[in-house]
Amino acid sequence: MSTRRQAIQGGDTIKNPATKFLSWKSNDKCFSYYDKEIAESLKGQPAETISKKANVKVNLPFRFLFLDQLQSVKGWSDALSGQIISNEVKTVSDQELNVVCYHKNAKGEPTKTTIAKGLYSQIKDAVVSAGAKYHKSVYVMLEDGSLANLQFKGACVKEWSEFFNRSKKRLADEWVIVESAKDGKKGAVKFTTPEFKFERSISDSES
């Protein structure tokens, strides 16, 4: 099993630090990730079938050790039928984002189109209108020692940020656990967010 120190330094997975990219599924009240190996094994089947089977739910409780957090924007462009992503930065207030959409051109060839470039405050309107949202990108170590990336957006950003800000001094030494979901409501829209708590201190062998 990897230790927290090895995970921060890259360990055996330095070429591809995160093995899973997880996001919170509000309706299901759990995390999920897209399994590329499952998707590859289903090649040739309808896209809806692949999407349903390759999106793997991770039931609660969910435990992790915090490693680092960055910020980015991600989303989907209906106009270009492609994925919008940006570079990850420590702070969007003073570091530029380069927001790009990866899609296919009229000939069906893979290409990319720049959506916007600059500080988030300067490009926010262009980014949102293109179909992307602000994300908090949190790198963690899972119970099996593998590295994962938690991608928070919307209400999940607020929930994580509040937990981080009030307890960041403890994050280096304790396991975080999500055992349940918190119900929320904005206008007529109901949603859930993960409820973060500390479970236990890390052992000497895990540090």
Placement of each model-derived feature along the sequence:
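Beta-strand/loop nucleic-acid-binding surfaces
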Residues: 146-167
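Short His-Asn-centered micro-motif
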Residues: 142, 152-153, 178-179
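Long, compositionally biased interface segments
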Residues: 161-207
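OB-fold ssDNA-binding interfaces and closely related basic DNA-contact patches used
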Residues: 1-145, 185-201
